[in-house]
Amino acid sequence: MATGTDQVVGLGLVALSLIIFTYYTAWVILLPFIDSQHVIHKYFLPRAYAIAIPLAAGHLLLLFVGIFITYVMLKNQNDTKKTQ
């Protein structure tokens, strides 16, 4: 069973994910249909970032996954050399 702290952290992460999803959905799907002079446009970044930010996040994710896999493989290789 999860502790109270775990539940609060989990709820916070879910809430943050929902906020980001709602913001990104409004930014990418709804904003192009709203007049460019409308006041709501000042709350969103330029549209070029709608592609650049997820692309950069994807690259960073792949980089960290690759580094982690490399680290684990090298560590396991060193452990097997020590036991032999």
UniProtKB/Swiss-Prot annotation:
Family, similarity comment: Belongs to the DPM2 family.
Function field: Regulates the biosynthesis of dolichol phosphate-mannose. Regulatory subunit of the dolichol-phosphate mannose (DPM) synthase complex; essential for the ER localization and stable expression of DPM1. Part of the glycosylphosphatidylinositol-N-acetylglucosaminyltransferase (GPI-GnT) complex that catalyzes the transfer of N-acetylglucosamine from UDP-N-acetylglucosamine to phosphatidylinositol and participates in the first step of GPI biosynthesis. May act by regulating the GPI-GNT complex.
Chief place where the protein resides: endoplasmic reticulum
Keyword terms of this UniProt record: Endoplasmic reticulum, Membrane, Transmembrane, Transmembrane helix
Protein name in the entry: Dolichol phosphate-mannose biosynthesis regulatory protein
Database matches in Pfam families: DPM2 (PF07297)
A GO CC term assigned to this protein in UniProt: dolichol-phosphate-mannose synthase complex
Membrane topology: Multi-pass membrane protein
Pathway connected to this protein: Protein modification; protein glycosylation
Gene giving rise to this polypeptide: DPM2
Compartments where located: Endoplasmic reticulum membrane
Superkingdom, taxonomy of origin: Eukaryota
Entries under InterPro entries matching the protein: DPM2
